[in-house]
Amino acid sequence: MGSSFGDLFRISTFGESHGGGVGVIVEGCPPRLELDLQKIQAELDRRKPGQSKISTPRKEEDQVEILSGLLNNTTLGTPIAMVVRNKDHKPGDYKEMNVAFRPSHADATYQAKYGIQARSGGGRASARETIARVAAGAIAKQLLTKAHNTEVLAWVKRIHTLEAEINAQDVSIDDVEANIVRCPNQVMAAQMVERIEAISREGDSCGGVIECVVRNAPMGLGMPVFDKLEADLAKAVMSLPASKGFEIGSGFGGTLLKGSEHNDAFLPSNDGRLRTATNNSGGIQGGITNGESIVIRVAFKPTATIRKDQQTIDADGNTTTLSAKGRHDPCVLPRAVPIVEAMVSLVLADHLLRQQGQCSLW
């Protein structure tokens, strides 16, 4: 009913921002996969709040507890249950939101749909729900690495009006993690940090674009016609809080090219893989991976909860002014990088198992 994702590699998430905790159940992970539990925690550490001066000051350790599905750190093929306890939630900081709807937030639509909602912390609409996705995605990452040495890596490409020139093939995890904004262009990263701080001082927020590359992706992933790989990738990242746009390869810029300019010419290869002179397709053609790197971009809107006064209405429809308190990110992008990686990894793990099941029997 909206809290599960995937077909064969399937996750179901639970929990609210100000509840007891957030967790996930992973079903369909193959048995005998030896997991590095430190890598799971490391991914959660990249996502956790309070990690820098440009993120929310909420302090959570986000230590993962694995409740089932492993024996000596090796998967059993049974459901893997993981939970992270909430320890630093302050419902009193949200009393303004108990009577007024935040503009462009899920408050009003959740109330309209369910007739009740957990206003404190945003409930299920809070980005804290993504803890579950990152924990599950960390397992999917390790599966992809073991099966095909596939690497999934994302970074911040744009903050507000500042856009970095980045060659997706040259970026390393060390480049991404070298600064708090997670932009591999170090010069532009410094400007991005300054921009976020300046906007935050105004009591405002900003958005931007995250780019993600998948290197060494197996050929043949994707299930035409309704489960094309780019369609499932789009659904995955567009399910994230604050996401507002998706493009792959040349994206919307490709509409400015002629067919002769946009087509990716095939090249001879000695390794049995398809090779192309360019990668405007973003590694996917006909909904199926062609062996080249997958390159996608995700647009995130400015954080809806801001300290500036905003005109809004209360639950009775009366006009009021809201100045939000609480602890919120002035820009979600630096912490969204591992979340995008997680969702892409979950899609690839699911399609890898589906490909094995349909096309690799003989």
Swiss-Prot record:
Keyword Glycoprotein present in the record's keywords: the answer is: no
- One cellular component term from this protein's GO annotations in UniProt: cytosol
Please give the catalytic activity noted in the UniProt record.
5-O-(1-carboxyvinyl)-3-phosphoshikimate = chorismate + phosphate
This enzyme's EC code(s): 4.2.3.5
Q: Which residues bind NADP(+)?
A: 47
SUPFAM superfamilies documented for this protein: Chorismate synthase, AroC (SSF103263)
What CDD domains does this protein map onto? Chorismate_synthase (cd07304)
Record pathway: Metabolic intermediate biosynthesis; chorismate biosynthesis; chorismate from D-erythrose 4-phosphate and phosphoenolpyruvate: step 7/7
Q: Which residues does FMN bind?
A: 124-126, 286, 301-305, 327
Gene3D superfamilies according to UniProt: Chorismate synthase AroC (3.60.150.10)
Q: How is the cofactor bound?
A: Reduced FMN (FMNH(2)).
Q: Does the keyword Transmembrane helix apply?
A: no
Q: Which biological process, per GO, is one annotated for this protein?
A: aromatic amino acid family biosynthetic process
Spell out where the chain crosses the membrane. none
Family the entry assigns: Belongs to the chorismate synthase family.
Q: What does this protein do?
A: This reaction introduces a second double bond into the aromatic ring system.
Subunit field text? Homotetramer.
Q: What is this protein called?
A: Chorismate synthase
Task: Please tell me the species this chain comes from.
Answer: Prochlorococcus marinus (strain MIT 9313)
What is this protein's gene name?
aroC
